[in-house]
């Protein structure tokens, strides 16, 4: 049973559920990570996967940016491939490479051999979420998972990929195997996120990091039904839900259809927008009543304060126009994760600026 808190004053929860926030809410994807010296010091003692599966460490890393910045939400420290590891997939996260899968999944037999999520294997992640709920006070906690397509991409390609050739070939040449794989990954994603919801997270975000590699036709045929099933299942639990991908301008409408498949009135459905698409354009593409999140270019943070201030003001103004055009709300974020070279002091000033506008 969920232990979610009642946080009526949260600007983040107000914006994602279509209510007027007291200020423009802001948080950053990868706000906990390599841009923080305290994170780098901790990671000298723990590998990425070890940190994800050690509750005290995951809790500490999640809290580090909350102590530094006046952000309006925390996001649980974990990794997209954690549920794959919890389903018995032999993988590692290699520095400067990313997730590497020992035995890629490329045949019907490979798909049939896949195991479901082991509930006991994700207990450390859920313990971390429970610890954070107790620590965060009035700051909401966002849980997250990778979307089925992005998990499939890692599994089929064997790691990060520029062209996603193997995954597209499987999708087009072996559609039965593809949909069987996606069905298993959808079940896994639902189980992982429901566990986080039951542990007390206040919202969830589903990252489809590689969806931008697909055409709108292929996305609708091979991905949308599975992503929609994730959100439909989560919608029964009454938490706000965000769907985010990179390079997805032409997919925003379909992605909003997925996230609103599980939306209940007043619960909140959000689509994340990267820096390539103006928020006002995104508002015209998504299902009416969907909130938007984004979308400062992460590289702008490296460009010096005058450039940061100009760009941030432009994003806030664009967000207000998007709301006027029908978006349910706007949450300020970067259009992707914080870059490792980012100066924490600049991010702190950016939060203060956004809150002042």
Swiss-Prot record:
Catalytically driven reaction(s): uroporphyrinogen III + 4 H(+) = coproporphyrinogen III + 4 CO2
UniProt-annotated binding residues for substrate: 30-34, 79, 154, 209, 336
Keyword Cytoplasm (UniProt): yes
GO biological process, one term: protoporphyrinogen IX biosynthetic process
Keywords of this entry: Cytoplasm, Decarboxylase, Lyase, Porphyrin biosynthesis
Site features described as Transition state stabilizer, chain residue numbers: 79
Positions of disulphide bridges: none
Matches recorded under Gene3D superfamilies: 3.20.20.210
Pathway annotation: Porphyrin-containing compound metabolism; protoporphyrin-IX biosynthesis; coproporphyrinogen-III from 5-aminolevulinate: step 4/4
Predominant localisation class: cytoplasm
The protein's Enzyme Commission number: 4.1.1.37
InterPro entries (alphabetical): UROD/MetE-like_sf, Uroporphyrinogen_deCO2ase_HemE, Uroporphyrinogen_deCOase
CC annotations in GO: cytosol
GO molecular-function terms, A-Z: uroporphyrinogen decarboxylase activity
Note: Was identified as a high-confidence drug target.
Family: Belongs to the uroporphyrinogen decarboxylase family.
Task performed by this protein: Catalyzes the decarboxylation of four acetate groups of uroporphyrinogen-III to yield coproporphyrinogen-III.
Quaternary structure, from the entry: Homodimer.
Name the record gives this protein: Uroporphyrinogen decarboxylase
Organism: Mycobacterium tuberculosis (strain ATCC 25618 / H37Rv)
């Amino acid at each position: 049973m969920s232990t979610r808190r009642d946080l009526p004053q949260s600007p983040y929860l107000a914006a994602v559920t279509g209510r007027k926030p007291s200020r423009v809410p802001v948080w950053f994807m990868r706000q906990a990570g390599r841009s923080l010296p305290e994170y780098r010091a901790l990671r000298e003692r723990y590998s990425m996967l070890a940190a994800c599966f050690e509750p005290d460490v995951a809790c500490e890393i999640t809290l580090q940016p909350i102590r530094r910045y006046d952000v309006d939400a925390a996001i649980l420290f974990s990794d997209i491939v954690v549920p794959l590891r919890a389903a018995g997939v032999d993988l590692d996260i290699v520095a400067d490479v990313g997730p590497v899968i020992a035995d890629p999944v490329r045949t019907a037999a490979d798909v049939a051999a896949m195991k479901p999520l082991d509930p006991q294997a994700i207990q450390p992640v859920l313990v971390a979420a429970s610890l954070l709920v107790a620590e965060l006070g009035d700051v909401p906690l966002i849980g997250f998972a990778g979307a089925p397509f992005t998990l499939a991409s890692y599994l089929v390609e064997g790691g990060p990929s520029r062209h996603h050739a193997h995954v597209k070939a499987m999708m087009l040449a072996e559609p039965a195997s593809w949909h069987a794989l996606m069905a298993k990954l959808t079940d896994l994603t639902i189980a992982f996120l429901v566990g986080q919801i039951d542990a007390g997270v206040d919202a969830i975000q589903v990252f489809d990091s590689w969806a931008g590699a697909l055409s709108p036709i292929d996305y609708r045929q091979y991905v949308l039904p599975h992503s929609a099933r994730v959100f439909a299942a989560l919608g029964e639990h009454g938490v706000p839900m965000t769907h985010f991908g990179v390079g997805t301008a032409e997919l925003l409408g379909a992605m909003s259809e997925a996230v609103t498949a599980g939306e209940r009135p007043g619960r909140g459905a959000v689509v994340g927008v990267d820096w390539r698409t103006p928020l006002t354009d995104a508002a015209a593409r998504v299902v009416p009543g969907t909130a938007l999140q984004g979308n400062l270019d992460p590289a702008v943070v490296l460009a010096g304060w005058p450039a940061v201030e100009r760009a941030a003001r432009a994003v806030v103004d664009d967000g207000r126009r998007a709301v006027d055009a029908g978006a349910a709300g706007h949450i300020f974020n970067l259009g992707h994760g914080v870059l490792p070279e980012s100066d924490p002091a600049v991010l702190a000033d950016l939060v203060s600026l956004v809150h002042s506008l």
